[in-house]
Each structure stands twice: as C-alpha cells, then as structure tokens.
C-alpha cells in the first residue's frame, strides 16, 4: 500500500504544513480567523499541546496573531513576517505566489554584488580556487545547482560579515528547488559558464570589477529565470534587452 506523503510527517510537521499551505493558497485569507483550538486539533487529528506549539511558532514568525480568549487571526505574512518566515516558506516552494522567486532574485541582486566584492578583496585566492573547478562542470542541472549555490555561500562566508551568510542560507531550499528548473535549460548553463569565466578575470582585475560582473550576472539571471519559467508554463515576463550571461 502506497502511503500518502503527509502520513510520513510527524504531528507538528503535519500541522505546520496544513496551516502554512492553507494560508498560502488562500484557504485562510488575511484577516480570517482560524477554528478554535479544540476544533482545529480534532480536525487535524493531533493533540492540543502539539497544535499550540506550532501556533506559537507561526505567530513568532508573523503568520498569525494569537488573541487569548479570542480567535487566532491570519496576518498578511508578506508585510508582517520576519526573516525567520523565509525558512518556513522555503519548505513549500510549490505554494509560493507567482513572482515570488523573482522578488527573491531581486533581493540577491541588491545583496550579492557587494558581498562578492568584499570576498574578492579579503580572500581572492579562495574564490579563484573554487572558480577554477567550474572548468570541470558537466552538463547536469544538479551539478550546476550545487556549484552555483556553493559559490554564493563561499563569497558570503568570506565577506567578513556573518550576517550575509545567515540571510543567504535562508534561501537554500527555495534556491535549490528552482535552480534545478533553471539549470535544466542549456542556455542557462552556458550563461553561467560565461559568468564564472568573467568573474575569474574580474578578481584578477579589481574588487570594483567583481561587483560589476556579479551585478550584471544577477540581473541577467532574473531575465533568464523568467524566460525559463515562461517556457515551462509559468508567468511570461521577458526582458528583450538582456544578454545571455548570468548565474542563478
């Protein structure tokens, strides 16, 4: 007998999945009240302490507001959530609204260029050593996804500011799920190879050149992502002025 994937979850995980996906898909819209604790626990088949534990954690992240003696209310998580909400969101990439990945890439466009510049300034040999491995990448989406993620984290961890790596690490699950889609496209892999070569040359030139190369590549990756999503049946917003070079 084939088990439902939800049957493999621990009770707290099941409650989290039910509540988060119900908020993301609009079952519980912003401002809506959740069923009372007794009713919701019975509906989900969990104990009230388990439900209470998950509710408190989701409230801390900004998903809901608990009013003692009154119904628990669903927040506008996009406006009231904190950074910890990203870690929870990353588990449910299939439920994210259209355009959310593009918004994340825009955040990375703002953050990663100065991070790369700092890393190239402080530890150029470390970054160059890793970039040298790009020559051995095979035409495989998983391999490109792993390499590109490790490059970003390497730059963040060598920027001499630990906050950068903490923020970037919150994107891990979302990034890896979308990167497999992105790097399944041959043009995306070619663009990334170009990016890695140009980044190598920029590090040998100057930190300012590094920042410029990364900024251009991150902007181009947004356009490439939108094109890939369009071809795979997602939303179609394509920048006709982009060049085909950029890593995800």
Regions found by a protein language model. Give the residues of each.
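Juxtamembrane/interface motifs at transmembrane-helix termini
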Residues: 7-8, 14, 52, 56, ...
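Long, low-complexity, charge-rich intrinsically disordered regions
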Residues: 157-160, 164-170
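Short loop-to-helix capping motifs
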Residues: 36-37, 160-162, 205-206
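Solvent-exposed, charged/polar functional surfaces in cytosolic regulatory/catalytic domains
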Residues: 18-22, 110, 114, 133, ...
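C-terminal all-alpha effector/ligand-binding and dimerization domain
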Residues: 135-136, 152, 169-248
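Amphipathic alpha-helical interaction elements
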Residues: 56, 116-120, 156-160, 180, ...
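Short linear motifs at protein or domain termini
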Residues: 1-110
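All-alpha effector-binding/dimerization core of bacterial HTH-type transcriptional repressors
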Residues: 79-154, 194-216
């Amino acid at each position: 007998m084939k088990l439902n994937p939800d049957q493999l979850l621990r009770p707290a995980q099941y409650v989290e999945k039910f509540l988060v996906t119900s908020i993301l898909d609009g079952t519980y819209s912003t401002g809506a009240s959740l069923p009372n604790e007794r009713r919701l626990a019975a509906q989900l088949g969990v104990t009230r302490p388990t439900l209470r534990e998950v509710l408190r954690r989701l409230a801390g992240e900004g998903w809901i507001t608990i009013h003692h003696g009154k119904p628990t209310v669903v927040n506008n998580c996009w406006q009231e959530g904190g950074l910890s909400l990203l870690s929870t969101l990353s588990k449910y990439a299939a439920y994210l609204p259209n355009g959310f990945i593009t918004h994340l890439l825009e955040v990375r466009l703002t953050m990663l260029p100065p991070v790369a510049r700092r890393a190239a300034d402080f530890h150029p040999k470390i970054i160059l050593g890793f970039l040298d491995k790009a020559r051995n990448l095979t035409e495989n989406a998983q391999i490109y996804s792993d390499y590109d993620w490790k490059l970003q984290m390497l730059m963040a961890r060598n920027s001499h500011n630990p906050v950068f790596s903490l923020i970037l690490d919150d994107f891990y699950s979302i990034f890896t799920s979308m990167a497999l889609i992105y790097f399944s496209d041959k043009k995306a892999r070619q663009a990334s190879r170009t990016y890695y070569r140009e980044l190598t040359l920029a590090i040998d030139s100057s930190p300012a050149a590094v920042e410029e190369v990364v900024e251009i590549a991150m902007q181009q990756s947004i356009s490439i992502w939108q094109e890939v999503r369009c071809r795979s049946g997602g939303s179609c917003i394509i920048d006709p002025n982009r060049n085909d070079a950029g890593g995800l």
